[in-house]
Each structure stands twice: as structure tokens, then as C-alpha cells.
Amino acid sequence: MNYRNIGLLTASHLVTDINQGALPAILPFLIAEHHLSYQAAASLVFALSMSSSIAQPLFGLYSDRMSKPWLIPIGVFLAGAGLSTLGLTSKYWLWFATVTLSGIGVAAFHPEGARLMNFVAG
């Protein structure tokens, strides 16, 4: 059992899940600062959730055929980059694109992370 790799995978999982859960916490600031409607704010949450939910089984099929450990750092990066760029623009369509990108990052991480955790945990 490789405790170092288990710790790294656990930390990576924490980071990706925090990214997915951070959007609802950020929304009140976006609503107040940019006068978003509740519908527009909810659409951002929907985009993040749906992109993750639709893409994750596809990434699972892709990584089941052959190990793709590079999906783990790419997924963590995309999840973080997607949400961190929310503050760089005030255009709604860019927010929608970045939260969708974040959802795809979360989706890319999970299947390969589960496979690798099973491998390193024995």
C-alpha cells in the first residue's frame, strides 16, 4: 500500500470536489456585483453539473479501455482553471463556458482517480 500516492489522490479528489461545490458559494457575489437574475445564476450551476454528469461516463469508457493517468492532473487543472477564471471577465457567456470547462475537469478526474486509487490501495 503506497500511502504517499493515496494521500496525493485524496488531496486531488478534495480539490476537484471543492471546485464543484464552490460555485454555489460564489453565486451571491456574482448576483450582487453583476446583477444576475436567479435564472442566470442557476443556469451556471446547471452547466457545471450537467457537463460533469454527461462527460464523466464518457471519460470512464475512455479510461476503461486503457489506463490514462494523465487525466488526473488535467482534470484537476481544468476544474481549478474553470472556476478561477470567473473573476477575470464579466461576460455571462464566458462564465458559462468556464464553469462548463470546470465540470469537464471534474468529470475527467473521477474515473481515472477511482481506478488509480484501487490500484495503489491494493
For each predicted feature, which ranges?
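Helix-loop boundary and gating motifs at the non-cytosolic
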Residues: 4-40
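Short hydrophobic/alpha-helical segments at membrane-entry points of transmembrane helices
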Residues: 9, 93-99
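Residue-level signature of mid-helix packing/kink "hotspots" within the transmembrane helices
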Residues: 21, 49-57
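Small-residue-mediated transmembrane helix hinge/kink sites in multi-pass secondary transporters
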Residues: 28, 57-61, 114-115
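Helix-to-coil boundary motifs at intracellular loop junctions of multi-pass secondary transporters
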Residues: 33-34, 65, 116-121
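Short hydrophobic/aromatic, small-residue-rich stretches within specific transmembrane helices
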Residues: 42-49
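Conserved MFS/SLC helix-loop-helix module at the cytosolic interface between two early adjacent transmembrane helices
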Residues: 54-93
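Cytoplasmic helix-loop-helix junction between adjacent transmembrane helices
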Residues: 98-122
